[in-house]
Amino acid sequence: MRSVPKLCSAIVLTWTLAACGSLPSQTFDHSVRAHIKRIQVVPIGTPEHAQARIMNPIGAGFGLVGNFVESQRAAGATQVVEGALADAHYDFRTSLANSIAQAVSKVGFTINRLTGARPDKERSRFLSKYPREKKVDAYLDVYATYVGFEAPQSSTAYRPRLELSARLVSAKDNTILFQDRIVYGCTENTDEEAVLVRADDKLSFRNRAAFQADPTKTARALQSAIDATAWELAKQFM
């Protein structure tokens, strides 16, 4: 396993990789760092909504009826999270883009941010083409497949979870300089090949009602997870 600060639940990652597909990793070759000074961050791909889910819900063991009940429960939890973030006037999409740009700039790159929207069909995959920019050495392409909260089981607390994929592409010849997945929200050890960040035990919510009880806390918890994930991405270039 690659060196990471903390490790994650094998069950969680197995489900995630099965759902999203594994991403071949490519570490950053620091020998090219002398030639990569200016990075343009393209618009970040994000889900339509912040989400909340239970990885192993109790109802899943009761066939189709149980699965239907759990799907309705998950939809309700997601609505609660969305409502809490709206009450806190918090936009996770803007926050994610800002945190990534700020984190990568802290490791020595000059950052430009491409304005405009990411194509809808490429919201959850890497861009098929990049702009031609003479004053840029590489493009940082990031998309998130999950942003929100997750509980391992029905009886356990929710904690923030992020799943994002990142690729650094040479502006000169479109060579892939770096590629990997970053997953925040891990709780136990695993041998899964991904850059994993352990969840902060202090950022927990006993149930979905807790999201609404303190919307500011909900937003701050998600922001903390976003900042930690962005910094872990930036560290890959150090």
Please report, for each region that a protein language model flagged, where it lies by residue.
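Bacterial N-terminal signal peptides that target proteins for export
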Residues: 1-11
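A structural "domain/chain start" motif
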Residues: 20-109, 231-238
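Surface-exposed short loop/turn segments
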Residues: 23-26, 120-175
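Short secondary-structure boundary motifs at beta->alpha junctions and helix caps
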Residues: 80-89, 171-230
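Short, solvent-exposed, polar/charged sequence segments at loop or secondary-structure edges
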Residues: 85-147, 208
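Solvent-exposed loop/turn segments at secondary-structure junctions
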Residues: 47-48, 118-119, 145-149, 183-189
